[in-house]
């Protein structure tokens, strides 16, 4: 289906030169150490092999190989299935897998001795295996994951990716997930691509010329969808507080994953000239673009463009993404650089957490000793907003005051074994349904007081007592 005549043609040198000029002219997205190969550049005389089964696809694979897997909505399910079947049929050992969250079936964690997974951001299909010691988790900032590959801390033998069919110039697109994948394909010895006619074509850093691929495997597959959960009354209230008090017209938005960021977006329909520079976005951004609230007109970097590194959501957002010149999908090392984030006007970073203690320490990746997610870009964007060049950035942690079981999320101490993702020095604004606590520059006694004021009323008295026991002084605003 995809073996078109152009796959066997030789490109004239003017086309090659123009492609290279276009690449270097677009390097506003560049923020990395150069790898041994540049996916934008055609490799003269090289043509990938088309495979029709696992034996043809993975015949070069050996024991102990390091394998990267494209994640998120672009998870290549066909290649995952065929990799598993090939390794098991050949009895290969010690295949090490590296990825951020993947979606869909993930059989590797039940094949001890054959595979070992390392999650650089944990998804639902790996949590149980990590907790049981059958898989691993690496705590790392999303912006620094590319350095694992570029500095050769992890020597990748193979990258499995999901791409669009090549265009008339021979370029494929990584679709909705550029994130850390660009660094992986720059540094992998072999690249195996699932060529997928249902993947949205994206721009920015998303391109790879087919001559950089080792193997192409046709595999039509819809993007993995994540339907947003409707916001609760509490989450809706938090969204309203943030939208009305902390987001100004002309602000540049970063929103994380979840009901609270979605609730904030739903309350911004009357705002004007908002911009988006975010590690990820979902369906909520589409509505604001369609209503004219998001124009990106005042952004200092890539004005007029929605900038992101990956997208999750439903068919609605993938249709919006497809071949849309308004959206640039870029290398996460650049997108999430605090130095880059700080250059945009009024950057607002909206993130959530699992719990926060009375001094401002934030746990986001774990529930006690149980690994739940990862560092992601929370610290990257909180820091970028905090040091914004215009002095108008707002780094926000938004969290309901209690769990579904009425347990307070503002706690005297983080749960035993819980990891600190965002330090108390990073935290400026904390928002619950009861209001806003501003912690920047406040001492521990003042922080405890501010956080207790936005805790659930049922827990404020006990938190005051616990704060006194911990700090040896009563919480006070002065």
Curated annotation (Swiss-Prot):
GO terms for cellular component: mitochondrion. This is Succinyl-CoA:acetate/propanoyl-CoA:succinate CoA transferase. The lineage of its organism: Eukaryota, Metazoa, Spiralia, Lophotrochozoa, Platyhelminthes. Residues 1-30 form a transit peptide. The active site is at residue 279. CoA binds at residues 256-260, 354, 377, 404. It comes from Fasciola hepatica. One of its GO terms (molecular function) is acetate CoA-transferase activity. Its EC number is 2.8.3.18, 2.8.3.27. Belongs to the acetyl-CoA hydrolase/transferase family.
